[in-house]
Amino acid sequence: MQAPPSFYEGDTLEVAKKLLGQKLVHIVNGIKRSGIIVEVEAYKGPDDKAAHSYGGRRTDRTEVMFGAPGHAYVYLIYGMYHCFNVITAPVGTPQGVLIRALEPVDGIEEIKLARYNKTDITKAQYKNLTNGPGKLCRALGITLEERGVSLQSDTLHIELVPEEKHISSQYKITAGPRINIDYAEEAVHYPWRFYYEGHPFVSKK
């Protein structure tokens, strides 16, 4: 079952934690690629100095952050790596959750090809398929084309995992500072990164 629009409403930190254990799905050329979300970071503009929308900054890139919750915000870093975010909070409140890492589930062969251009990979390469925001976007074929797309779409959405299959019973949710935001002054220390402690696909321990 797809997460309904109401799933993305409410406090961004709570939505971030709710996203853990759910399945991010992207259909590419009719083939389902997916992964279980194991690591996220919350960004709470306009007061969060780490957020692209800090101070209410409104640009062509960030405009989607000011829109309705439950849409995709995709951007490039270093001019080459895509990052996928879920927009949260009410219209006009520019907040979102960065998906930092996944455990691959569906379309494994396509994911391997997308990441390594081959399907015969080592155990170390397998562990590196989706353990970072840029890696998971490449693996799932998420690009700037997906910016602004509703997560109610048939081709890009979050699937809710039934409680009996949910991995939250196997891993403890841990909170800590976000990664690679040295520019963000006091916001560097906000414990707004949430992840499954000990999960092999988490990007950093």
Curated annotation (Swiss-Prot):
Superkingdom as given in the UniProt entry: Bacteria
Family matches, as Gene3D superfamilies: Methylpurine-DNA glycosylase (MPG)
EC number: 3.2.2.-
Lineage start: Bacteria, Bacillati, Bacillota, Bacilli, Bacillales
The protein, known as: Putative 3-methyladenine DNA glycosylase
HAMAP family (alphabetical): 3MGH
InterPro entries: Formyl_transferase-like_C_sf, MPG, MPG_sf
Any single Pfam family the record assigns to this protein: Pur_DNA_glyco
GO molecular function, one term: DNA binding
A Gene Ontology biological process term: base-excision repair
